[in-house]
C-alpha cells in the first residue's frame, strides 16, 4: 500500500490514474516540454536543469493537467550544486513579462537557509517552510508533491515534510501546466509520474489519554 496521509485525507496513490510517465527521450523532450530562462536537456531518460542565475529557470509541460495533481519523481542536485530541487504544478507562464504566473512551488533545500516548503506564485505571500537538516547535496530523494483543492503537501522519501491549506486555491481549469525549476543550481529529475489524485476522507480524532 502506497497511500499518503495528510490532515483528514488519505491519498490513494495506486488508484490515482497516471497522466504522464516514462523516460524522457530527446523526442519526448521536444514534443512535451518547453524551457524558459535556463538550460534544460534530457540525458538517460532524465531531465537535467542548469541555471547560474538567481531566478526561475524552468522546464514546463506543453499540455495542461487540470484537477488535483500529484507530482511523483526522484530528484537530486548535481554537484557542486548544493540546493534547490524545485517542482511546480497548477502552473501558467506570463509570456509578456517572461515570468512565472500562477503556480504552487515546492522546494527541497531552498529559500537560502536550507528549507523544505511550499509557496504560491506570483505574489509569494502564502508560504510554509521548515528546515531540512537531513538534506545531503548530490543524494537522490523521492519527492511526492501536489494539492487537493488547495490543500498542498510535500513528502520526501515517504515522510510528510510540510502541508499548507490555501484559502483561495489556484483555478486548475486555467492554470494547469507542471514543471521543474533550476534556481541558481544544477539538478536532475528522473522517473517522473504525474497522477490525477484519488483520495478519501480520513477523519482524525485523539484517543483519550486520561
Q: What positions do the PLM features span?
A:
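Extracellular carbohydrate-recognition regions
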Residues: 1-35, 201-210
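Carbohydrate-binding surfaces in secreted/extracellular proteins
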Residues: 23-24, 73, 135-167
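Short, exposed beta-strand/loop patches in secreted or surface proteins that constitute
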Residues: 37-43, 62, 109, 145, ...
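Short carbohydrate-recognition loop motifs
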Residues: 38-57
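Secretory/extracellular carbohydrate-interaction modules
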Residues: 51-118
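Beta-strand-rich interaction surfaces with strong enrichment in secreted/lumenal proteins
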Residues: 57-63, 129-135, 178-179
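Short, aromatic/His-centered strand-loop micro-motif at the edge of beta-sheets
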Residues: 120-142
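Flexible glycan-contacting loops in extracellular carbohydrate-active proteins
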Residues: 164-193
Amino acid at each position: 500500500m502506497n497511500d499518503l496521509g495528510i490532515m483528514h485525507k488519505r491519498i490513494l496513490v495506486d488508484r490515482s490514474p497516471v497522466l504522464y510517465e516514462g523516460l524522457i527521450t530527446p523526442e519526448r523532450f521536444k514534443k512535451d516540454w518547453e524551457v524558459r530562462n535556463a538550460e534544460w536537456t534530457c540525458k538517460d531518460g532524465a531531465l537535467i536543469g542548469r541555471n547560474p542565475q538567481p531566478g526561475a529557470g524552468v522546464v514546463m509541460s506543453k499540455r495542461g493537467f487540470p484537477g488535483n495533481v500529484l507530482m511523483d519523481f526522484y530528484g537530486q542536485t548535481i554537484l557542486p550544486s548544493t540546493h534547490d530541487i524545485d517542482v511546480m504544478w497548477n502552473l501558467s507562464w506570463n509570456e509578456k513579462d517572461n515570468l512565472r504566473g500562477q503556480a504552487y512551488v515546492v522546494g527541497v533545500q531552498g529559500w537560502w537557509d536550507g528549507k523544505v516548503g511550499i509557496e504560491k506564485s506570483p505574489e509569494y505571500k502564502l508560504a510554509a517552510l521548515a528546515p531540512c537538516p537531513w538534506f545531503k547535496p548530490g543524494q537522490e530523494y523521492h519527492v511526492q508533491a501536489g494539492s487537493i483543492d488547495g490543500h498542498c503537501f510535500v513528502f520526501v522519501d515517504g515522510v510528510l515534510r510540510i502541508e499548507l491549506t490555501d484559502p483561495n486555491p489556484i483555478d486548475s481549469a486555467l492554470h494547469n501546466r507542471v514543471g521543474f525549476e533550476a534556481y541558481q543550481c544544477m539538478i536532475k529529475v528522473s522517473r517522473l509520474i504525474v497522477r490525477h489524485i484519488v483520495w478519501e476522507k480520513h477523519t482524525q480524532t485523539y484517543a483519550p489519554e486520561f
